[in-house]
Design a protein with these regions (language model features):
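Asp-based, Mg2+/Mn2+-dependent phosphohydrolase catalytic module
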Residues: 2-32, 42-43, 47-61, 66-176
């Protein structure tokens, strides 16, 4: 399997990430996918998402939403969390991730990407040189093209679980 498809970490939920520890390690920018990463597909920001972004801002993180959706969808979510966003990002192309870092004032050494899809989120962030955290999708209801991709992702995750320590070593802490 290709290492660029493997995340640096694979966790149950965005909400189980230890963001306090990541800040202590020197990370300052977090780029998020929205649908099935922060809320179910198409949903507005809920209390849990709003609380998360409030906490991240209090810690000192610069946050960005990076989505392939059109602006009305991204803006609907962002109206409650008030962070920077890029819509129609063209993931997995690395240009959107690089633009996000430029807006945030961060670089590959102190930026993290959190998303729920391997072929768009993880692949693009890896190509841009950003630490990746893959999370399990929040809700099983998805569009048909994503359902088909999930079957291929299951194969990648099988190889990841079997070989990730050999293929891709644990990511080093960010420089301060």
């Amino acid at each position: 399997m290709c290492a660029f498809l493997y995340p640096d970490e694979y966790l149950d939920s965005t909400y189980s990430i230890d963001f306090d520890q990541l800040y202590k390690e020197g990370y300052r920018g977090i780029i998020f996918d929205i649908d099935n990463t922060l809320v179910p597909h198409g949903a507005p920001a809920d209390e849990r998402a709003i609380s998360l972004f409030t906490h991240l801002k209090e810690l000192g993180f610069h946050c960005m939403l990076l989505s392939n959706n059109k602006e009305p969808r991204v803006k609907m979510f962002n109206d409650a969390v008030h962070v920077n966003y890029i819509y129609k990002a063209g993931k997995p192309k690395p240009a959107g991730y690089r633009k996000a870092m430029a807006v945030l004032g961060t670089d590959t050494s102190n930026t993290i990407f959190v998303g729920d899809q391997i072929f768009t989120d993880v692949c693009g962030a890896n190509l841009a040189g950003i630490r990746t955290i893959l999370v399990k999708p929040i809700h099983p209801k998805e569009e048909i093209q994503i359902v088909l991709k999930r079957r291929l992702e299951a194969i990648v995750l099988l190889f990841y679980r079997l070989h990730c320590k050999i293929v891709k070593p644990k990511y080093q802490s960010a420089r301060k």
